[in-house]
């Protein structure tokens, strides 16, 4: 699969450059070692403070702070000092994985796997003749905090929003072990991909990461 080769090259380069969320590297390696599937953009889950120039204007938004672990109240409060323009939100988002399957049968297996792992927003669609499965959970939080540099909530509200956002992040990340276990079972069923191990050697992945 030419597309898988390109996706793996992109992933391994990003790993070397420190641009991949560390707590899902093992899982990404596992998924990509499976024959007939590969990952594209994925995230281990995150929480942070973001400015959006207008509702839904994601391309022009600016993160004031973004972390892939529970955030501290003081971190959030300090980040708000850098707010300038737009609507200010605290956002908590669950892990998300985009996985491409080479055929409809594998896409269906991935869809069932995501749902069985507790990722209830898992869907799949056909894009440019590719079967793309989005493994996604339900724990999303968007809490408005202010506008145009003005924080319109008190510390009590901010602390509460941070607490709820962190709890949602922990809960969604807590499903990752089950997801990994189910992908291991899928690998036993579908087999491993020689291309993956070929590129592992080319990019010297074993020097820094243990293969699943």
Swiss-Prot record:
EC number: 2.1.1.282
SUPFAM superfamilies documented for this protein: SSo0622-like (SSF111278)
Reaction equation(s) it catalyzes: 4-demethyl-7-[(3S)-3-amino-3-carboxypropyl]wyosine(37) in tRNA(Phe) + S-adenosyl-L-methionine = 7-[(3S)-3-amino-3-carboxypropyl]wyosine(37) in tRNA(Phe) + S-adenosyl-L-homocysteine + H(+)
Any GO BP annotation: wybutosine biosynthetic process
Top-rank lineage group of the source organism: Archaea
Coiled-coil region: none
Gene3D superfamilies per the UniProt record, alphabetical: tRNA wybutosine-synthesizing-like
GO MF annotation: an example: tRNA methyltransferase activity
Keywords carried by this UniProt record: Methyltransferase, S-adenosyl-L-methionine, Transferase, tRNA processing
PANTHER family: TRNA WYBUTOSINE-SYNTHESIZING PROTEIN 3
Entry's family note: Belongs to the TYW3 family.
Record function comment: S-adenosyl-L-methionine-dependent methyltransferase that acts as a component of the wyosine derivatives biosynthesis pathway.
Protein's UniProt name: tRNA(Phe) 7-((3-amino-3-carboxypropyl)-4-demethylwyosine(37)-N(4))-methyltransferase 2
Gene that specifies this protein: taw3-2
